[in-house]
């Protein structure tokens, strides 16, 4: 079996990880990398899903590696909630969202700004060096245009030796991006809004090239980071070597085991998404997306002003129902200057037997 080494963790890493990560070379036909067209009984517009979710958190917001490890145990125990095809080692998707592991990142990237003054994100790239370089150049251009500062790119260390043929064939190159705001001028909510704009603007330019359809930003935020992929729940911990490090600590962890049913599995459709993860089906998806598109012309944001128009459309046919829900939630959070619980309550209001609900309710 052929392997090649990629993705060192840096001079401060453990000896095993500093040698890089094991990555197999795929021999599966390239046709397995693409979403299938409408054919026979398959129609992407009729896709549905049902998944498993779980969360571990410290009520005192104290980060620890135990929370991350316990979340992995929870994820593995939800294997029955996930799915796979004829290959038991090619999953429908699984992942984990944690707080930004500041101590871990400082060990491998000395000189980071203070916590909350930099954002971190994991990005999927087409698996060839030329495409990776092109995507990075586009991101760096938008970083400069938004007045942000590039801290570092880091090849994410992974071990793909346990992946099945289908997952392996569609496996992306994965890079971690560290971005800071203007020194002393941007942090917290304002910086997260700019990171959201950066992700949307750069992603739109990258994906305008049909050859870049595998490009995807898992997350880009000052407070959370997402590790996910077309994996089984059992594969997440072994695939992402970062998660195994004792100083990878978090005050919370959100995990998701995906059951695709009719939804075609992919690395990007795995969850958690950037703001949330979702279990179930949105049966009114097409109507929801149509109504969202119809409202875009009248959207106004005091926080973004005229720049909001450059971030549209919000929803996409490439995303699952959960992915579109996540995108609209982010719009309400960043452009609407709302907290996440407010955004979710607006999108899924509580049941009420009368025609109108009192504003104070």
List the predicted regions and their residue ranges.
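N-terminal chloroplast transit peptides
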Residues: 1-17
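Conserved short alpha-helical segments that host acidic/polar catalytic motifs at enzyme active sites
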Residues: 2, 19-361
């Amino acid at each position: 079996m052929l392997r090649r080494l990629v993705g060192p963790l840096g001079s401060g890493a453990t000896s095993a990880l500093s040698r890089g990560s094991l990555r197999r070379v795929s021999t599966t036909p390239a046709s397995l990398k693409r979403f299938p067209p409408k054919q026979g009984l398959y129609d992407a517009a009729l896709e549905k899903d049902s998944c498993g979710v779980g969360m571990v958190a410290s009520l005192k917001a104290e980060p620890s590696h135990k929370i991350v490890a316990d979340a992995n145990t929870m994820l593995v125990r939800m294997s029955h909630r996930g799915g796979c095809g004829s290959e038991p080692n090619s999953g429908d998707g699984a992942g984990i969202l944690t707080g930004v592991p500041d101590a871990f990142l400082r060990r491998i990237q000395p000189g980071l700004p203070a916590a909350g003054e930099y954002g971190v994100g994991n990005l999927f790239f087409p698996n060839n060096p030329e495409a990776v370089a092109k995507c990075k150049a586009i991101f760096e251009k938008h970083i400069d245009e938004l007045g942000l500062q590039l801290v570092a790119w880091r090849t994410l260390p992974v071990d793909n030796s346990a992946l099945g043929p289908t997952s392996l064939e569609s496996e992306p190159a994965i890079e971690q991006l560290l971005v800071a705001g203007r020194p002393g001028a941007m942090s917290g909510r304002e910086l997260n809004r700019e990171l959201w704009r950066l992700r949307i603007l750069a992603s739109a330019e990258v994906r305008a090239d049909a050859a870049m359809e595998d490009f995807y930003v898992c997350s880009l935020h000052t407070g959370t980071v997402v590790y996910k992929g077309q994996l089984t729940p059992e594969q997440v911990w072994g695939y992402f070597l970062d998660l195994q490090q004792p100083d990878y600590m978090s005050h919370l962890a959100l995990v998701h085991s995906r059951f695709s049913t009719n939804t075609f599995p992919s690395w990007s459709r795995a969850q958690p998404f950037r703001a949330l993860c979702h279990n179930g089906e949105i049966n009114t998806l097409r109507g929801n997306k149509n109504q969202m598109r119809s409202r875009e012309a009248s959207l106004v944001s005091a926080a973004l002003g005229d720049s909001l128009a450059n971030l549209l459309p919000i929803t996409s046919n490439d995303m699952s129902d959960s992915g579109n829900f996540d995108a609209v939630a982010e719009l309400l959070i960043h452009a609407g200057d709302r907290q996440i619980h407010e955004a979710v309550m607006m999108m899924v209001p509580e049941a009420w037997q009368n025609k109108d609900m009192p504003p104070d309710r």
